[in-house]
């Protein structure tokens, strides 16, 4: 009976959402403690916060919020005691604040930042690359990614990411299957990306990749659906095939 609600952009769904909002606001505005709760929350929010720092290439990277920003800014320090510099301000992504910074991945030498952007809370992400020295966002744009990290090659040439086939119908409601693992080289078009791994025979599998510091191993962590357990596959440098280390969903495994 609720199938019609899957049409996110439909007028009927929009009208229903508006009615639901009106109903909830009528109830919430009657709460005699509403103003006091709001004031108390705002007093808590207005405080500086910093994320755990990461060090790459001698630079320190971290998220910072002075308390009133809707989204934290991504900052860098060239050295301890140096003045902080802002690299990414997601509050400028859109006027209504619906475009957010989802995740960041710093290249090993600290010269590039791969970061993903989400629009309207969607699981779909677009990956972009920032050059730290100039604070310039490059032309690289990687679309149709979802539930993906960016795993850098130790030589800083590029990173691996998970991509789904472009939806044929409605991007927000279509079921996504058959993800593919690609390698993107910094400064190139997504059309030039190299396909690293896919399993059309296992459409519900998804994976993340870890590259050893010496570049001798590529380790795939393979999940299935929402199961926390995973498989582990490995590929040695110079080889073409990933070999299973753990090929059954028995436990959760991590490569150290």
What are these model-derived regions, one by one?
Residues 1-256:
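Beta-propeller folds
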């Amino acid at each position: 009976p609720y199938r019609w609600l899957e049409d996110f952009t439909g007028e009927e769904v929009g009208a229903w959402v508006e009615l639901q909002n009106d109903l909830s606001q009528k109830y919430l505005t009657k709460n005699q403690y509403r103003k006091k709760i709001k004031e108390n929350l705002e007093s808590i929010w207005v405080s500086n916060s910093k994320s755990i720092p990461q060090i790459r290439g001698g630079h320190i990277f971290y998220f910072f919020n002075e308390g009133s920003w809707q989204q934290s800014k991504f900052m860098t320090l060239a050295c301890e005691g140096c003045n902080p510099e802002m690299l990414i301000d997601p509050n400028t992504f859109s006027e209504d604040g619906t475009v957010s910074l989802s995740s960041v991945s710093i290249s090993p030498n600290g010269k590039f930042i791969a970061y993903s952007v989400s629009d309207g809370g969607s699981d779909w992400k677009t990956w972009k690359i920032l050059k730290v020295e100039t604070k310039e966002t490059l032309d690289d744009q990687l679309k149709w990614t979802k539930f993906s990290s960016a795993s850098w090659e130790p030589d800083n040439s590029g990173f691996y990411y998970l991509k789904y086939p472009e939806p044929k119908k409605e991007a927000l409601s279509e079921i996504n299957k058959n993800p593919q693992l690609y390698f993107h080289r910094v400064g190139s078009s997504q059309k030039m990306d190299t396909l690293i791994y896919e399993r059309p025979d296992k459409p519900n599998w998804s994976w993340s990749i870890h590259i050893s510091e010496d570049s001798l191993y590529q380790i795939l962590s393979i999940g299935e659906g929402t199961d926390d357990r995973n498989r582990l596959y490995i590929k040695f440098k110079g080889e073409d095939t990933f070999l299973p280390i753990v090929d059954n969903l028995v436990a959760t495994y991590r490569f150290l």
